[in-house]
Amino acid sequence: MSEIIYISLNDLLIRYPELTDTIKGQYLLLLSELTYTSYIETSMFLKNVEKISEFGCIIVGIINNSSSFEIVASGTIIIEPKIIREGRNVGHIEDIVVSKEMRGKGISQKILDKLKSIAREKNCYKVILDCDDDVKKVYMKNGFNVKGFQMAEYFD
């Protein structure tokens, strides 16, 4: 197996600006293995990646071959400043996904480790995430504990 490189999506776009549409396409295809995705204009995609970079980071795992690369995994962390806990931060981990072909190879652990490292660098006192019941064991193996319940109200 080729080596997987872990890099922020923002840095990947900066490094390969001529491949923006390819990167966007691969990233959305990967996310579609996690949830519903719809078409997004390239300008909006770039704007949102930049916005997320202001408050956190999207990490992608790529297989880099000599002439091309493939995005095979991703995870996002958003940093929330808090008034409690001496003003320290909370890291919100979102959108963890590994392509079906690459699951079971420890890639999600590496993505989570990278995101937790960012959380420590950003003075977070904890990281939290929501997940479906059928994958909670993956997160428990990576140091997470079940706490409370997720609640949501969708507007669309």
Model feature map: region roles:
Residues 2-43:
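Short amphipathic alpha-helix that is part of the acyltransferase structural core
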Residues 49-61, 92:
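A short helix-loop-beta-strand connector motif used in the catalytic cores of GNAT acetyltransferases and
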Residues 70, 81-93, 103:
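A conserved beta-turn-beta hairpin within the catalytic core of GNAT-like acetyltransferases
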Residues 109, 121, 125-126, 132-156:
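Conserved active-site alpha-helix within GNAT-family acetyltransferase domains
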